[in-house]
Amino acid sequence: MPIKVLFCFVVLYTTWILKGNSQQVLQWRGTDRTGVFQESNLLKSWPEGGPALLWEFDGLGNGYSSPVITSTMIYVNGEVDTISYMFALDLSGKFLWKVEIGKEWTLSYPGSRSTPTIVDDLIYVTAGWGTVACLEAKTGKERWSIDMVKDFHGPINRFGFSESLLVEGDKVFCAPGGIDSNVVALDRFTGRIKWICKGLGEMTSYCSPQLIKLQARNIFVTFSKNALLGIDTKDGALLWSHKQDGNGDVHVNTPLFEDGYIYYITGDGSGSVKLKLSNDGTTITEVWKNSACDNTMGGFIKLDNYIYTASYGKRIWYIQDVTTGKLVDSIKFDKGTTNLADSLLYLYNEKGQMGIFKPVGPKMKMVSSFKITRGTKAHFAHPVICNGILYVRHGKSLLAYDIKEK
């Protein structure tokens, strides 16, 4: 091979490798889906009435999905007249454009569910009746779309397709929940099928999945109706499953992987569970299970040796020891979502109260709180913290609060 040609090949190959390794993913509950936002110099307490409201946008349509913020734009989807739209705003909350995604869920709790996933210059999102779409982030132009019901025989469930799509390399994953097409990997640039996993042949269960990266393999982790599934991202092989107690089918919370262990919480199954994952990722061993810890869709935060999460049955918040699985304390605060930023827990409950709490080992103490009075319908959406701004979606409204310490 001539030296010039060889040199050009090396430069192009190196550029491709660097581009692949620098892939920027903005998604549900932060960059790694743990609910932890890497922020600093945030307010340690709020004035009475809450932090300053920077702006409000009131035209989103119905929905419970969270916004995703880039360096220049904000993306969030909502339902208007039965259709799911992707909305684009600038960082001041000014409307830029909206584009149609597909038919949105309008039965039980009408509105968008799926938080968009943004990888470099492309957006991936799901609509409630099964559309999966790839859009150009700059203009909203559709690159491709598929229908999980028509194309993969996904059954219609009680609350609509809800997952926030997961991307790995050149693949985007979706869970139609069909008997023959349970989980599907698509080429994220073309929408063509990479592989199909039959799983256990069970209906999907509203979970936004997690990606576990090991030396031996990467594993796609999600829930079907009655089990947690671990699937090899390379070929779609089902590696293992963990059966749920009872007959519930709502397993919304994204699992967590840390230091060789998988943690998950479901209010409609086994409760809180810790699993040991083998080094090669092919087997799991149950460490403990606590059915009293029953968060349904508010997420949870693991900080050091403790998990902080809401109880959906008792409308309180639990602190759980991750070594033993025992509940070591609780506080009175209505059920809702939880995030962590700059060493403080951000709790947003279903009555509209937003609070910051200081976690101290097996305890947590409320520092400040205020009521979200703007917006419409249920307080379900998970807040987002980005560059010192707290973004709260409440139905048709997106609110931006200044929480940066001056």
PLM-predicted stretches and their roles:
Residues M1-Q24:
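Bacterial Sec-dependent N-terminal signal peptides
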Residues Q23-A52, E142:
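Blade/loop signatures of beta-propeller domains
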Residues G30-R33, E79-D81, G128, G177-G178, ...:
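Short loop/turn segments immediately following the C-termini of beta-strands
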Residues L54-V68, I83, K98-T117, S145-V167, ...:
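Extracytoplasmic beta-rich repeat domains
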Residues D90-K94, E136-T139, D187-T190, D232-G236, ...:
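Short loop/turn segments that connect beta-strands within beta-propeller blades
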Residues S270, A292-P359:
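Loop/turn-rich, solvent-exposed surfaces of beta-rich toroidal or solenoidal domains
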Residues S270, T376-K406:
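Blade-level signature of beta-propeller repeat domains, shared across WD40, Kelch, NHL, RCC1
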